Structures are given as C-alpha cells and as structure tokens.
Amino acid sequence: MKQFYTLLLMVFVSIGCTTDKQLTSYVNPLLGTATLWEPEDLGYVRTWKNRTWGAEVFPGASLPNAMVQLSPVTQFRSGAGYQYEDTVIYGFAHTNKGHWNLLHLPMLPATGEISASDYASGYSHLNESARPGYYQVFLEKYGINAELTSTLRCGYHRYTFPKGVEKKLIADMTRTNNRVKDWNIQQEEEYVFTGFQDTDGKIYFYAVSNYPIKDIRQVKDDKHEISLVYFGESRKNEPLELKIGFSFVSVKNAKMNLDKEMIHKDFTQVAKEADKTWEELLSHIKVTGGTTREKGIFYSTLYRSFLWPALRSDVNGDFTDERGNVVNEGFRYYTNPSFWDDYRNKLVLLGMISPDVTTDIIKSITDKGEKRGGYMPTFFHGDHASVFVAGSWLRGITGFDLERAYKLLLKNATVPGQGGRPYLDEYLKRGWIAEKDTTHVPTWDEYKAAVTKTVEYAYDDYATALIAKELGDQENHDLLMRHSGNYKNLFDPSTGFFRGKIETGSWIADFDPYYPYFAYMYREANAWNSLFFAPHDPEGMIALYPDHKAVEQKLDSLFTEPWRGYEAHNMTGFIGNYCHGNQPSHSIPYTYYFIGKQEKAQCVLDSIMGRFYDMGEEKLAYAGMDDAGEMSAWYVLNAIGLYTYSPADPEYIVSVPLFDKVTFTLGDNTTFTILKEGNGKKIRQIRYDGDVINGWFVTHDQLKKGRELVITTAE
C-alpha cells in the first residue's frame, strides 16, 4: 500500500510539472540594478569620478502601484538607493521610485556593539535573492538572514539571527534620499513603536514586533546619529518579525492600514499573496515562442512597468492633499506620474491592464491641479498630462470628470503663470521659445531647452485639442490645432535638424548637432537625438524635407554616424547617434514606416531589444534610466508588436513581435490575440479579425473586440 501511495504521489508531481510555468518565475527584480562601466556599452571612455547613471531601479518587495516599496539601501542620495556593484547595505527603506528621492525609514537588524557611523553590513550576491513581492539577503557583519515582503501599505520584516544573540534594530531616522526636516520614534506599547519622518511632508509608521521592546535609545558619534531599538527576551531563537503600517496622514491611520492588511497574517502568507497579485497582473499578457532570455526580459520589464505611480491614500480613503489638509474624496490618491518619461508608453500600458488605477491617477492629478493654482501638474519638462488624459479617455477610460481635467489643461496651454508651462508667454506670442546665444558650452539648468519645449508643447496642444473636440469646444480646438504645428517653427531646412533661435529670430550660430547639451536648445539630447518629434503629424514632419530619400538618408545617418565620445549625463546606449538610454529618441525608429521602409525600422527595434536590456558583465544593466517604468514599457510594447507612437491617439503602430503568439487580456477582461506568421523583418500584411488593415496602425476599439491580429512577415 505504501508503494501505491508513493507511486500516486509521483504521478501527481509529474502532472504538476506539465502545468504552465508561473510567470513570476521569469521576473528578475535585480535586472536593471547594475551600472554600465565599459566604453563599448557607455559609448565613451569614463573619466568622471562618479559612476554613470544606471536604470536606477530597486530589487525589493512591492505590490503594483503600492504605497510601500521595501528595499535595501546600499547608498543614500543615489537614484533608487541600490547599486548592484556596492558591497554594503545600510538598511531596508520603505518607499522608492528611482529618482533620487524617498527611501523613508531605513531599518537594519543588528547585534553586538554598534557604531552610529559605521553600522552598514557587507553582503554577497551569492546569498541574495528576489522575486516579485519578496527580497532576501544575508547580512555578513551580523550573521543575520533578512527577508522582506509587503502589502499595499505595509512592510513585513523577518530577521533570522544567530542562536542566542541579543536582537537589536537600527532605525536611521535622520536619513532618506532627501533632507530630513524632522523625525520622531518612540515606544507606544510593549510590542509597538511609532513615529514619523518629515522630508517634503510627513510619513507616519506604526510598527509591531513579535518581541517585547525593552528600550529605544539614540546613539551618536561625531559623524552621525541613529536610533537603536532593544528587544526583551531577545536571546530566544525565533526570528525577529516586524509588521509596519504606513500612512501619509497619521500614526492612527498607519495602525488602521496595518490592522486591515497584515496584522493577522504570517510572513509566508503575505509573501504568497504578493506573488499571487503579481501573477494575476503578469497573466494579462501571455506569450508563446521566443527564448527563455526574451521571456525573462519581457516579464521583468512588465513587472517593472507597474511600480509607479505610488498609492498615497489609506484603506479608509483618507489622504493629505496639496494644501496639507486631510480629506477623503472617494478615490485612491496617487503620486504624480513621471510625465516627461512615461506618457510615451507606460501610462497607456497601465490603462490597458489597470484602467481603475488610471482613473484614480487622473482624479488625483485633477485634485492637485485644482488646489495648486488651477494648473494641471507637470513633471520636470513638457506638459504631458494632456497626452495622458486624452489618450486614456479616447481608449474608453471615462470614469473621471473630463471637463474638470480639461479646464486645468486648457489653462496650462493658454494662460502663462506660476505653476503652468515655463516660457508659455513666448510660445504663445511667437509660436516658439527663444534660446540664449552663446559660444560657451552650457551646463545644467542655466538655459531653457527651448527647442525641446517648443516641439513638446506643440504635441501637448494637439492632445488638449482632442479633449476640446470631445467636449464640443470648437474655438479652442481650432486654436490648439493651429498651435500643434508650432514644431515646424524651429526646423532648419538648411541642416535638416530642429535648431534653436535667438530673440531676433535668427538661428543660433554656434550649432553642433553632435554635441549633447543638457539644457541648451535640447533637454538631455543633441540635435540628432531630437529628430522627427511630431508624433501627431508624421507626414507633416516628413514634408519639411525635400523628399522621402532625404528623410531616409537622415535616418540612416542617425543610426550609423558614430557617437563622438562625449560624456553626458543620462546618455548611454548608442546605435550611431541614436541614444536608447534616454527617452527623447524612443519614437524615432518608426519614422521609417512613413517613407515605406518599415523593415529598416524593424532592424533597429530588434537591435535595441537584443542589446540594451541585459547589458554589462552581470547581464543586469539597462542602457539607461528606467525613469519610473518608461524604458521597461518600451520593451514590453515592442516585444508584442504594438507601440504607442502617438499616445494621445487611441491606436498602436504595428511591428514584428518577438513572440509567435501573444494573448492580451485587457482590464475589462476582453482578450485579443496577436499571431506572427513568418520570421522576417518586413511586414507583408496585417489582418484583424480576418480583414486586411491598410496602413500600419490598429485602433484600441479594434483590440477591444477581442479578435486576432495577424502579422504576416517576409524575409
């Protein structure tokens, strides 16, 4: 009988092995954490003392668009706090984006004598692991195995100490990635400590330990100060566990979040639930074919696309608004998107899979705009909330007040003022923004990035015009559509580049299309990187050149003229002068489509996907910053053969997928399929639901019908 049961168990195991592999198992949260060092990857020989920017992503535990990102800190004042090549860990912080901010409440378990300025622990990547919703590392200095998992608003720490040692916890309350204005940590109950950190607003925490708290002391030396939590009964051998709730409202709400999400669950349960949440999200896109490497990059980049924006409201709906008031408006409140980056692709991908989150993000930015002078929030550069709102509405995400959002966006586009578009008065007066005339190499933010602003404002005006049309505002629609042609005002036909002008209207004389300006004429780009940006009007853009042959020659030169060895902030990963390590170039390859050379575009797209997402010695580096998921979403969409060439428009340019079959389930549970026929780079035919598509675009409404998109290729 025993042999029978053993045989039966083997059968069940065998059956289990034939089931589909979990998609979370393809995800490597460490992908993107390494930095590029070699000249062939960077595009130049490094001379700066500081390391170049990597993808600036974190490997720790989080849920999709959560409040908590619980992740190791290897260096403060770095992009995401974690760099793969670093050798020590300072703590595990609870918020993260990857933009040199956040990293709230870093904590580290410890034992023995502890120095306030020298407490970081060494670690080895051989004893480090990560998967969606879970992170583990062995802290060599203290002999402690650290494990982390999380819910939306709570972090769970499990620390396994050496047997018989005294357990302590370092809380580095004076550190985040920003300046800490104020902080507090105190014992609340026998097993509870609470507090806050104040950087650009307060984040509160409520922490529950499975060991009684004996004392909380401040330890300082001439360099630094830390808080040290001592635990009673701490020589017992059970792991030290901490369940920590967070809130941007109050300690009371942090406790409420903890009680709702985590307090009655153990570590294994929380980690399993996190894995399940990610599995459900990743399962929206299932792929067949491709290599194991391609699937690994695909699901890792899909995972990475859903970590930002971050939740800022509590389980009861409370949040702290732009005026510092605690309010409850009946929606989940989120941080602003990283608009200069992710409007291009990631925010569309977010809406395709999580339209409910998109709806609440738009409600959030509208609430902020109404309370900050009547302007819709912008981010860093450009005014791309217009693209996000228009593209979301036209794709059927209509659960927000479009008129309220439009009122803000129209003010952004037409009324100069603090909080609106920089240099809008110039743009409205002339149709372009003037730049200073100089013969000196400019640096950083002394200049206007006038070319980039002008061409981007033109596209933003187009997006706002689409909303005006939806609302029947014909007068402003016509005005904004006229403004959408302003990109032409800075096109220099004598050079074939967008080029800066001075106040008089003359072209800037000292013009070098190869030089990578940081903020002079172009934003983090040179003239080559800035070519062909008119996603709303590619035919009009192309018509600025003498003929299609001239456009083809310009494109060919872009991808073959070698980068001239300049060291530039945020510019790495080159094909000729095309830079994939930063966003401005990301739509350029598709220009080939509009001159009848789609196959040339595909050669470039395949090269980008093949080269720039697992670079470096460890195969863990991106070509450049992920910028809150934009770089990742670029890969996801191109890998399935649908790209958001003009994200304001509800359509996708079709390319050759990496995979033979893609099954995509939208957020409304409609499923469409993408099939690739042949292995060539030239698209011979595109069919949807059996009908041939004339042109290169498939609409969102077509995809919502849940049919087959068949892409037939030829060599």
Predicted regions mapped to residue ranges:
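Bacterial Sec-dependent N-terminal signal peptides
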Residues: M1-K21
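Hydrophobic, small-residue-rich alpha-helical packing segments that form membrane-like cores
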Residues: E456-D460
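Surface-exposed interfaces of beta-sheet-rich extracellular modules
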Residues: K676-G690
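Accessory carbohydrate-recognition regions in carbohydrate-active enzymes
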Residues: T19-L347, G351-V387, L394-V455, A468-N489, ...
